UniProtKB/Swiss-Prot annotation:
Domain PARP catalytic residues, every copy: 969-1174
Taxonomic lineage from the root: Eukaryota, Metazoa, Ecdysozoa, Arthropoda, Hexapoda
EC numbers on record: 2.4.2.30, 2.4.2.-
GO process annotations (BP): positive regulation of canonical Wnt signaling pathway; positive regulation of JNK cascade; positive regulation of proteasomal ubiquitin-dependent protein catabolic process; positive regulation of protein catabolic process; positive regulation of telomere capping; positive regulation of ubiquitin-dependent protein catabolic process; protein localization to chromosome, telomeric region
Coiled-coil stretches noted in the UniProt entry, renumbered to this chain: none
Protein name: Poly [ADP-ribose] polymerase tankyrase
Chain positions of ANK repeats: 56-85, 89-118, 122-151, 209-238, 242-271, 275-304, 362-394, 398-427, 431-458, 483-513, 519-548, 552-581, 585-614, 638-668, 672-701, 705-734, 738-767, 771-799
Gene giving rise to this polypeptide: Tnks
Length: 1181
């Protein structure tokens, strides 16, 4: 718009040009300059809205706002200044302060009621003004107070079209977007409120997942931020790059309150992302239990499938959560069916498990929702629910029972169903009101409640009785209730203890009144039949006749037993009821309970002397009346044989039901006279045995042959059962009629673990049976014999061992200082680094090899290694005399060393990091990489050079305390031998390469000899101890070991304290004679997660490392199945797990002390793809 068409010179009038005699000039000047004292002095009700007639007809507020005088603006507003006053151009005070960027004044005016969308004569809004003048803060304030950014001025321009470069991002929603997103993520409410507008509330991040502020706030549980965003129009349906809505984020991280806020704001609980994951998938897979419950209560469907055809139930990681989700889903489906009164759907859903499902947030049960349904099928639905066991008196969160709701809504059919089923007629809600209070205005409802003994005298918390709320016609009814005896019978039926108490105490004779219009039942008949326990107890205590029979000859005990009311039955029997009383048809209470399948009642009656053989008029015993489906009742009536059968079959539930103090030690009279514990022990039914022992079973009971339960467990090798029996003080040396102890049984049957257990708990290995045989004479298995031999060691063998030890000590040779160096090393290298002693060791394949003792010796100041020798010792493959070698005589610092290696460009870096020669001597590849030497070639060159320098000068050398790794050349005999052992011990494993990868050969990259004096001396000492304890035989072998903690082992040795008790043979250190088996553990148990770089268990790129170790096995305990141990068995130094059907495929060697093994070689290798193997390579799997 051209300036000629509209003058935008706001406040351009020079007040100095106004006539000197203008009486308002001083006021306008004071407002302009912000002189608050002068303004207060000059302002009056007449001048507060005065006009500048010499200018644009502005008011004092125009001037103060335009010049940003906040105090003056505030005073003028408090003094009655018009906030909507217009000057001659239609400008309001808000236009002025917006145009000049006075953000504080803008907020003050908006707070005082100024319209953010007011327009001037050219249809300019304050936002047009602020946008065109580049006033960012003002634009933010206006948008935050509802400014409409789509309004067009008289030239059809929006604020965005007029926006300055600075304000354009505000109007596009891009202004400081990253800060806004970060504020939402971090929960910075003040910063968020300062930046938030309707235009950026749903902005998406420019990178990453393209999340909105609501995504971030929901994911990081910023409840306050979420509330602010939702209040400002945040879209709960916005999706990020992966199709996730904010509800996905909140549910995934288990943020319950945020989830609730989003759902209340209209979030779709079944929203799908790009992979068809719903919020419930996220919550279930992360075990967010409370969030799952919330989603299900709002209609989430756990049966929806994601792209992997998995439902939310499938995604739950635990069985408990899967069952809970399925249970709650069924419960909410039933609640929905009841809410809609869908009887056919409810029939399909209802079952005893969910009929009393409670809505987690309203407390409503299916019966509550059925009662309030307006549908005509309400009664049919309620009857269905009550038949299935719906609780009649459950209260919801408002403390209302179903009867309160039915009375409130005057649903007579619902009231009748509830009352007939025994709902509490005088239940109180949170206001102390009964159902009678709720329907006091309606005569039919009141009459119905009074027929069930509703109490008209109950006063609510508001001090009102039902009569005070009743209409005139109802009031008469309430003042003349039915007679007291009828009332008593109805109260006993309904379980109204207060009414029963009041009537009986006022008229004690009425306690045995009769229902003359019915079956001549007494109040006790009704109370017993309807399971009114407190009423039964009260009536019995006040003279009710327990023998009173109705006109069919039924006593109250018949009623209680027929309907399965256990507590009532117990009370009646306790008060003298005859358990064998008969009605007119000769039915006893046991007949009634058996015919109705009431197991607990039958058990109670039998306990108190009920006769299971008594016949009714048709000649039927209680057992004859049992239904085919009631197996438990039939078993109970069978007697001890059922308990013995349950113990034998391991049916714990049956055992629990059938056991009584009288039957727990019953006998199998038709068999070996066994007890239930004999059978449970012999058939390895641990849970049954444990239950029997905890409930008083005789642990030392003998059967017909004199066997106790421990004999059975030992004979059949049931280790856990035997341990349980020993825990319960069984006699471990008990004998049967033939003098056999449990140890005889276990030894004869080759039960190694049981023999060990029995011996550990005092079993006597010398006891003889009637034929004079000890357990060892009956033993068939070698390992059992070894175990018993150890336990029966004589004093003679101890003396022989002592003599052998002395002989070994006196005859041990002194180290030969002139022995040959290790094969493959030069004599000068050997003399400088290795002890000259050599030993013969047994390799994994069974071959033997002569090795030098791997102990580094301190270097003398005169010791020197030639460059060629140094290169060889450090594994400088392919080195030559042309390689750069540091001159030890001229190198005194790092700069000189780097110069000798032609690495001048690294001098500044090393000086900045203050790296000395001593420090450099201790550094490795990773350390150099961290300080900035990223090129592998440079690092290799440095490490090679420093190794040579250390060899010739001793710089940084501490071989006595630290581990030294000596590289072996590929043509070295030791290198060749190790490689041959690696390749020759590859085997095919049962997991088909899942743990260690699929391969048929290795690529051996490097073999390093481990030298550590401290570790070697510790190993040598332990090896000597083992030899002395094992007839001078340490049984040393070379075995493989794979572990993700190779470096720690090389530096500090093996440590049994870190062994895992969950291993097959307990908390030991495991070795293998096959390299492929150890390869399975290089990245952890079962291959862990694979190599660090590619997370691939079968990675053919990344180098791996394992150890070839010396292991002093000593005397090994042979084991064929898993057994958890914390140390080697007594008299043994190791455990050897032997292959067996259903057990190990290849042998394992386990020691339980770290000093029993020494890491001899560190092997770096790669597994090779089978396709990459040369055609001539032999398949050694």
């Amino acid at each position: 718009m051209a300036n000629s068409s509209r003058s935008r010179a706001i406040l351009s009038v020079n007040l100095d040009a106004v006539m000197a005699n203008d009486p308002l000039r001083e006021l306008f000047e004071a407002c302009k300059t912000g002189e608050i004292a002068k303004v207060k002095k000059l302002i009056t009700p007449q001048t507060v809205n005065a006009r500048d007639t010499a200018g644009r007809k502005s008011t004092p507020l125009h001037f103060a706002a335009g010049y940003g005088r906040r105090e003056v603006v505030e005073f003028l507003l408090n003094s009655g200044a018009s906030i909507q006053a217009c000057d001659e151009g239609g400008l309001h005070p808000l236009h002025n302060c917006c145009s000049f960027g006075h953000a504080e004044v803008v907020r003050l005016l908006l707070k005082a009621g100024a319209s953010p969308n007011t327009t001037d004569n050219w249809n300019y809004t304050p936002l047009h003004e602020a946008a065109s003048k580049g006033k960012v803060d003002v634009c933010l304030a206006l948008l935050q107070h509802g400014a409409n950014h789509t309004i067009r001025n008289s030239e059809q321009k929006t604020p965005l079209e007029l926006a300055d470069e600075a304000t354009r991002p505000v109007l596009t929603g891009e202004y400081r977007k990253d800060e806004l997103l970060e504020a939402a993520r971090s929960g910075a409410e003040d910063r968020l409120l300062a930046l938030l507008t309707p235009l950026n509330v749903n902005c998406h991040a420019s990178d990453g997942r393209r999340s909105t502020p609501l995504h971030l706030a929901a994911g990081y549980n910023r409840i306050g931020i979420v509330e602010i965003l939702l209040a400002n129009g945040a879209d709960v349906h916005a999706k990020d790059k992966g199709g996730l809505v904010p509800l996905h984020n909140a549910c995934s991280y288990g943020h319950f309150d945020v989830t609730k806020l989003l759902i209340q704001a209209g979030a779709n609980v079944n929203a799908n992302d790009l992979w068809a994951f719903t919020p419930l998938h996220e919550a279930a897979s992360k075990s967010r239990v409370e969030v799952c419950s919330l989603l299900l209560s709002r209609g989430a469907d756990p049966t929806l499938l994601n792209c992997h055809s998995k439902s939310a139930i499938d995604a739950a990681p635990t069985r408990e959560l899967r069952e809970r989700i399925a249970f709650e889903y069924k419960g909410h489906c039933l609640l929905d069916a009841c809410r809609k009164c869908d009887v056919s759907r409810a029939k399909k859903l209802v079952c005893a498990e969910i009929v009393n499902f409670v809505h987690p947030y309203t407390g409503d049960t299916p019966l509550h929702l059925a009662v309030v349904s307006p549908d005509g099928k309400r009664k049919q639905l309620m009857e269905l629910l009550t038949r299935k066991g719906s609780l009649l008196n459950e209260k919801n969160k408002a403390f209302l029972t179903p009867l309160h709701l039915a009375a409130e809504l005057l649903h007579y059919d619902a009231m009748e169903v509830l009352l007939k089923q025994g709902a509490k007629v005088n239940a109180l809600d949170s206001l102390g009101q009964t159902p009678l209070h709720r329907c006091a205005r309606d005569e039919q409802a009141v009459r119905l409640l009074l027929s069930y003994a509703a109490d008209t005298n109950i006063v609510s918390l508001e001090g009102l009785t039902a009569a005070q709320l009743a209409s005139d016609s109802v009031l008469k009814l309430l003042k003349n209730p039915p007679d007291s005896e009828t009332h008593l019978l109805e109260a006993a039926k309904a379980g109204d203890l207060d009414t029963v108490r009041r009537i009986v105490l006022n008229n004690p004779i009425s306690v045995n009144c009769r229902d003359l219009d019915g079956r001549h039942s007494t109040p006790l008949h009704f109370a017993a039949g309807f399971n009114r326990v407190p009423v039964v107890q009260f009536l019995l205590e006040h003279g009710a006749e327990v023998y009173a029979a109705d006109k069919g000859g039924l006593v109250p005990l018949h009623n209680a037993c027929s309907y399965g009311h256990y507590e009532v039955t117990e009370l009646l029997v306790k008060h003298g009821a005859n358990v064998n009383v008969s009605d007119l048809w000769k039915f006893t209470p046991l007949h009634e309970a058996a015919a109705k399948g009431k197991y607990d009642i039958c058990k109670l009656l039998l306990k108190h002397g009920a006769d299971p053989m008594k016949k009714n008029r048709d000649g039927a015993t209680p057992a004859d009346l049992v239904k085919e489906s009631d197996h438990d009742v039939a078993e109970l009536l069978r007697g001890p044989s059922a308990l013995l059968d349950a113990a034998k079959k391991g049916n714990l539930a049956r055992v629990q039901r059938l056991v009584t103090p009288e039957s727990i030690n019953c006998r199998d009279a038709q068999g070996r006279n066994s007890t239930p514990l004999h059978l449970a022990a012999g058939y390895n039914n641990f849970e049954c045995a444990e239950y029997l022992l905890e409930n008083g079973a005789d642990v030392n009971a003998q059967d017909k042959g004199g066997l106790i339960p421990l004999h059975n467990a030992s004979s059949y090798g049931h280790l856990d059962i035997a341990a349980l029996l020993i825990k319960h003080k069984t006699v471990v040396n008990a004998t049967d009629k033939w003098g056999f102890t449990p140890l005889h049984e276990a030894a004869q049957k080759g039960r190694t673990q049981l023999c060990s257990l029995l011996l550990a708990h005092g079993a006597d290995a010398y006891m003889k049976n009637q034929e004079g045989q000890t357990p060892i004479e009956l033993a068939t298995a070698d390992d059992v014999k070894c175990l018993l031999q150890d336990a029966m060691a004589t004093s003679l063998s101890q003396q022989a061992l002592s003599a052998s030890t002395q002989s070994l000590t006196s005859s041990s040779p002194a180290p030969d200082a002139t022995a040959a160096a290790a094969p493959g090393t030069s004599s000068s290298s050997s003399s400088a680094i290795l002890s000259p002693t050599t030993e013969t060791v047994l390799l994994p394949t069974g071959a033997s090899m002569i090795l030098s003792v791997p102990v580094p010796l301190p270097l003398s100041s005169s010791t020197r290694i030639s460059p060629a020798q140094g290169a060889e010792a450090n594994g400088a493959e392919g080195s030559s005399s042309d390689d750069l070698l540091p001159d030890a005589d001229t190198i005194t610092n790092v700069s000189g060393f780097l110069s000798s290696q032609q690495l001048h460009h690294l001098i500044e870096l090393f000086e900045r990091e203050q790296i000395t020669l001593d420090i450099l001597a201790e550094m490795g590849h990773d350390d150099l990489k961290q300080v900035g030497v990223s090129a592998y070639g440079f690092r290799h060159k440095i490490l090679k050079g420093i190794a040579q320098l250390r060899s010739t000068t001793g710089i940084g050398n501490n071989v006595n305390l630290c581990t030294l790794l000596v590289d072996l050349l590929p043509d070295d005999k030791e290198f060749v031998a190790v490689e041959e052992e690696m390749q020759a011990t590859i085997r095919e494993h049962r997991d088909n390469g899942q743990a260690g990868g699929y391969f048929t050969r290795y690529n051996i990259i490097r073999v390093q000899k481990v030298q550590n004096r401290k570790l070697w001396e510790r190993y040598a000492h332990r090896r000597q101890e083992i030899a002395e304890e094992n007839f001078l035989q340490s049984n040393e072998r070379m075995l493989f070991h794979g572990s993700p903690f190779i470096n720690a082992i090389v530096q500090r040795g093996f440590d049994e304290r870190h062994a895992y008790i969950g291993g097959m043979f307990g908390a030991g250190i495991y070795f293998a004679e096959h390299s492929s088996k150890s390869n399975q553990y290089v990245y952890g148990i079962g291959g862990g997660i694979g190599c660090p770089s590619h997370k691939d268990k079968s990675c053919y790129v990344c180098p791996r490392q394992l150890l070839l170790c010396r292991v002093a096995l000593g005397k090994s305990f042979l084991q064929y199945s898993a057994m958890k141990m914390a140390h080697a068995p007594p008299g043994h130094h190791s455990v050897v797990g032997r292959p067996s059907a259903g057990g190990l495929h290849f042998a394992e060697y386990v020691v339980y002390r770290g000093e029993q093994s020494y890491p001899e070689y560190l092997i770096t290798y790669q597994i090779v793809k089978p396709d990459d193997s040369s055609s001539g390579t032999e398949d050694t799997r």
